[in-house]
A protein has these predicted regions:
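Small-residue-rich hydrophobic transmembrane alpha-helices
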Residues: 50-110, 147-166, 271-335, 369-383, ...
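Short runs within selected transmembrane alpha-helices of multi-pass transporters and secretion channels
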Residues: 71, 140-158, 166-174, 195-208, ...
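Short alpha-helical transmembrane segments in multi-pass integral membrane proteins
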Residues: 1-20, 78-143, 187-241, 297-364, ...
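Transmembrane helical elements of multi-pass membrane transporters/channels
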Residues: 18-37, 139, 173, 202-206, ...
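Helix-terminus/linker motif at the lipid-water interface of multi-pass membrane proteins
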Residues: 28, 32-50, 120-127, 183-190, ...
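Interfacial/gating helices of multi-pass transporter permease domains
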Residues: 18, 41-61, 127-132, 192-193, ...
Length: 447
């Protein structure tokens, strides 16, 4: 029995906790990595530069979600074949996905580079920060293939039950990004451009290290495989496409929401951008738990251990409840201090009000997001993608409709008031679908 097979041998609580904790810790470092640009730019350059970096966040998240969604399609099949010990098919999926999705990343990177100005103008980015935002975005797209490779390989590692290696790489990358940010922004005075270059270098080095380590790991599984298999690509896309649509649809929705925020001015955008970073910190905890559930479910489905799936789902819900409580207490006690990390002395009272109101509202309702992510994780692991996609579209529709209709008339607060309603609706739809499609031993065969 391989040591990587603990997801199908240890108790569900131990298996999921041991597997999820490095991913949760990694989520903090992921956000430290992401926030480094914002914090350092906000402190050493000013709130306008922070707004420029923040203005890119919704758009860059769309492309990140494409990478993550692509990884999900490959990861579910890798987990299932790994659980069934069909290592040749597993390696075929890995090779096919890397070839296909890296080509896609190059196409998207070229598109983003040449259309950066049009994209940011279309989001109604304030004129005083448009040039900096476009500059940051173009450098970001140059490094997009590295970002794509790193995210797909991280998914591959977790799919075979290895969550510590991505954590180590993420810690290294985060520290490198912070040091490069400090040198280029605070030391060399390169401003927004320096922050973007620092991120590009950190992403590139992390992607190369990830590839070399994963290649070494795959060589341990002695079996023949195809470098590219069209049929396996189709199987992968059946799972990846709904996941890409779900994740990118939500991010596109956030772009539209940002377009609603932008007319309120640079200070409103700075406050909104600050809290979006904080939201991402806590959101990634729940996302990590959901992402841990998916390979756990898929491996146990492949190993025909159906009884362990429900137990694992319950463990995930308990973890979500604990972290939602931590998020609530942290935000209630420290929301002003957290906002000041991003806004600094340059932030106005209005920016602090936007940031604080948004942050506290999220703190009350993060539990809804947690149970939604755990339920979505089970659906992904089982390959039940249609209700998963529908639930997330309903979530987005609620959030967008309230923001678009109410915020321009009644104030910026309506941008975030509907968020927990969308999370709860998403959970209820996903839960009903899961109850109707709960796996039996007949499902435990690989299609």
């Amino acid at each position: 029995m391989s040591k990587d097979e603990y997801l199908i041998t240890d108790t569900p609580f131990k298996a999921l906790t041991v597997f999820a904790m490095p991913m949760i810790i990694g989520s903090f470092f992921q956000q430290i990595y992401n926030m480094a640009d914002s914090v350092i730019v906000g402190q050493f350059v000013g709130s306008s530069a922070l707004a420029a970096v923040g203005a890119c966040a919704a758009l860059t998240n769309v492309f990140i979600c494409v990478a993550l969604g692509a990884g999900v399609g490959a990861g579910v099949l890798v987990s299932r074949y790994f659980g069934a010990r069909e290592y040749g098919k597993m390696k075929t999926i890995v090779s096919t996905s890397l070839i296909s999705f890296l080509l896609l990343s190059i196409v998207l990177g070229v598109f983003g580079f040449f259309f950066a100005n049009s994209l940011m103008s279309g989001l109604q980015t304030p004129a005083d920060i448009l040039d900096d935002a476009v500059l940051y975005l173009r450098v970001y797209f140059v490094g997009f293939p590295f970002l794509f490779m790193y995210n797909i390989l991280s998914t591959m590692f977790t799919s075979i039950g290895e969550s510590k290696i991505p954590l180590g790489l993420l810690i290294f990358s985060s520290i490198l990004n912070i040091l490069m940010d400090l040198w280029m922004v605070a030391g060399l005075g390169l401003g927004v451009f320096g922050a973007a270059i620092a991120t590009l270098i950190a992403q590139g080095i992390s992607a190369v290290f990830s590839f070399l380590i994963f290649l070494s790991r795959m060589r341990q599984y002695k079996s023949s495989f195809s470098r590219f298999d069209r049929q396996e690509l189709y199987s992968m896309l059946r799972i990846a496409v709904p996941s890409v649509l779900q994740q990118s649809t939500v991010s596109i929705g956030m772009m539209i929401v940002q377009a609603v925020v932008n007319p309120f001015g640079t200070q409103a955008l700075a406050g909104y951008a600050a809290t979006m970073r904080v939201e991402n910190v806590f959101s990634l905890i729940f996302v990590s738990i959901g992402n841990a559930v998916s390979p756990y479910v898929s491996q146990n489905l492949g190993a025909k251990k159906i009884d362990r799936i429900k137990k694992g789902y319950h463990v995930a819900l308990v973890l979500d409840l604990c972290f939602a409580a931590i998020a609530f207490v942290t935000i209630e006690a420290l929301h002003t201090q957290i906002s000041s990390l991003f806004l600094g002395k340059d932030g106005t009272a209005f920016a602090y009000q936007v940031s604080g109101d948004y942050m506290r509202w999220l703190g009350y309702f993060f539990i809804f997001m947690g149970i939604k992510m755990a339920t979505d994780g089970v659906l992904r692991g089982l390959g039940i993608m249609r209700p998963f996609l529908v639930a997330n579209i309903v979530n987005l529709a609620i959030r967008l409709s309230v923001a678009l209709i109410c915020a321009p008339r009644f104030g910026i607060a309506f941008v975030w008031l509907a968020i927990p309603v969308g999370w709860l609706a998403n959970f209820l739809i996903s839960y009903v679908a899961l109850r109707r499609s709960w796996p039996t031993n007949k499902m435990a065969s690989i299609s």
